[in-house]
């Protein structure tokens, strides 16, 4: 392959020497650069061969971006780049991705090429399409990064003069810096106490990196960066670490003394509630609870919503008292574990069955029936059975009817259904069976009159109702 490339370029070079109008033929120029771009991908490059190849080359400004290609080769001898610069390739042109050669060399940590480009006029303050200068690209070993910072600053890189798309300067954009690099950047004038356009400081941003470390946050705090500052959404660093799927206990321990665990962001979440929502282990939640003098109702409600009976027990041990409202909520959200925990601690809601029906949690209805909760709950004139009709849920209705509602409950059920003009069709068979099994029901004039009207209003006109006349 390399022999073919050399031969092609040699042929182009000879043709150029024979034809004084060679460069008026753009195809020849582009062909030469094409073969030179192929040579960039060849592993064993020879500088003398490269120089010979360049004899057939003139910068064309086409899409091969020869200088960019060679600046992006790791470990490349800077003399290759020097030859291209001498040949007339500009260090201040962008490729199709908006990158300058200096950005590319910075990204791959080739400081010798960085130095070569700078000495040939590369602009250290040029911005790529992400509005980043070369100072933003600080990967590599500490020594490599510090050397590159020194080079860029020496050739005029401006401090605190640019922000990228996220509103970050070079220091803030470095989400996982070493202490040595961080201090170096600060020593040349970068401001450490700045935030990005979302209000996040260095600790926020470090916590959002792939591998946040307590040691990094520790020295950031020693340099004066606030561990409790909220961003524009109200999230403190503790909010961020508590919201992660994998919790870093060392970081939580570090941030805990400086942050109120009940401090809410604009979405109503606190570090404590975020721990509960992400199903964190109880011992970790207990760690945060131990720093709080107040356990809010919101915390209890979230424990119930996420079925965290283990956390309810911890909260109870810390003196929080539960009541029927908590039991009601546990029923409404279908939290079987929390209902069981509260029931074991003699906390109940008399109308629990009614709220279970409203929520249509069949498992909860079954659990309450098993524990002998009454089906005769009446709330604002509505019964469990009338709500089954409203919800058109014959399955739950059948479960309730098997547990012997009282005659008064059935009377109130009919009243509620008629008042709200609900569809009677699903309950008519159940009421008929109820009356059949409870003959005393029709001996009560109030019940019987209501039942007769309930049925006759439902059946088509012209049907005889003499069966009802035998009672009174």
UniProtKB/Swiss-Prot annotation:
Localisation per UniProt entry: Host cytoplasm
One GO CC term, this protein: host cell cytoplasm
Record PROSITE patterns: ANK_REP_REGION, ANK_REPEAT
Disulphide-bonded residues: none
Residue spans of the ANK repeats: 97-126, 130-161, 233-263, 267-297, 322-351, 353-377
Keywords noted in UniProt: ANK repeat, Early protein, Host cytoplasm, Host-virus interaction, Modulation of host cell apoptosis by virus, Repeat
Classification via SMART domains: ANK
GO biological process: symbiont-mediated perturbation of host apoptosis
Top-level division of the source organism's lineage: Viruses
One Pfam family linked to the record: Ank_2
Induction comment from the UniProt entry of this chain: Expressed in the early phase of the viral replicative cycle.
Principal location class: host cell
Assembly description: May interact with host caspase-9-Apaf-1 complex.
PANTHER family noted in UniProt: ANKYRIN REPEAT AND PROTEIN KINASE DOMAIN-CONTAINING PROTEIN, ANKYRIN REPEAT-CONTAINING PROTEIN-RELATED
Family membership: Belongs to the orthopoxvirus OPG037 protein family.
Function: Inhibits host apoptosis. Acts by associating with host apoptosome.
Protein's UniProt name: Inhibitor of Apoptosis OPG037
């Amino acid at each position: 392959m390399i022999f073919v490339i050399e031969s092609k370029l040699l042929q182009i070079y000879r043709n150029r020497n024979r034809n004084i109008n060679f460069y008026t033929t753009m195809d020849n120029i582009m062909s030469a650069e094409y073969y030179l771009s192929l040579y960039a991908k060849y592993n064993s490059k020879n500088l003398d061969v490269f120089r010979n190849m360049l004899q057939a080359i003139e910068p064309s400004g086409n899409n091969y971006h020869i200088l960019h290609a060679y600046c992006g080769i790791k470990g490349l001898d800077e003399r290759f780049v020097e030859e291209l610069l001498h040949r007339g390739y500009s260090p201040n042109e962008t490729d199709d991705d908006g990158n300058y050669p200096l950005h590319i060399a910075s990204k791959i940590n080739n400081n010798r090429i960085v130095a070569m480009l700078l000495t040939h006029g590369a602009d250290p303050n040029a911005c790529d399409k992400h509005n980043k200068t070369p100072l933003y690209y600080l990967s590599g070993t500490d020594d490599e990064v510090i050397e590159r910072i020194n080079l860029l600053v020496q050739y005029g890189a401006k401090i605190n003069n640019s922000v990228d798309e996220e509103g970050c300067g070079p220091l803030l954009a470095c989400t996982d810096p070493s202490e040595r690099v961080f201090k170096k950047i600060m020593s040349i004038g970068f401001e450490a106490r700045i935030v990005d356009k979302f209000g996040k400081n260095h600790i926020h941003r470090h916590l959002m990196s792939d591998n946040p470390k307590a040691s990094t946050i520790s020295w950031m705090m020693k340099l004066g960066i606030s561990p409790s500052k909220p961003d524009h959404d109200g999230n403190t660093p503790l909010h961020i670490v508590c919201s992660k799927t994998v919790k870093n206990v060392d970081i939580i321990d570090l941030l805990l003394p400086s942050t109120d665990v009940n401090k809410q962001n604009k979405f109503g979440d606190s570090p404590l509630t975020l721990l509960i929502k992400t199903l964190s282990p109880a011992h970790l939640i207990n760690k945060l609870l131990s720093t709080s003098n107040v356990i809010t109702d919101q915390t209890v409600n979230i424990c119930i919503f996420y079925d965290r009976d283990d956390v309810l027990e911890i909260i109870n041990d810390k003196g929080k008292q539960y009541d029927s409202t908590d039991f009601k909520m546990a029923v409404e959200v279908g939290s079987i574990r929390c209902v069981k925990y509260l029931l074991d601690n003699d906390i109940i809601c008399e109308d629990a069955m009614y709220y279970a029906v409203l929520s249509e949690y069949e498992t909860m209805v079954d659990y309450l029936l098993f524990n002998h909760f009454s089906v005769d709950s009446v709330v604002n004139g509505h019964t469990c059975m009338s709500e089954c009709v409203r919800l058109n849920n014959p399955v739950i209705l059948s479960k309730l009817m098997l547990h012997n509602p009282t005659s008064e409950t059935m009377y109130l059920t009919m009243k509620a259904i008629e008042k709200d003009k609900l569809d009677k069709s699903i309950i008519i068979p159940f009421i008929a069976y109820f009356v059949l099994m409870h003959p005393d029901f029709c001996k009560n004039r109030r019940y019987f009159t209501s039942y007769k009207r309930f049925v006759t209003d439902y059946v088509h006109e012209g049907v005889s109702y003499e069966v009802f006349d035998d009672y009174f």
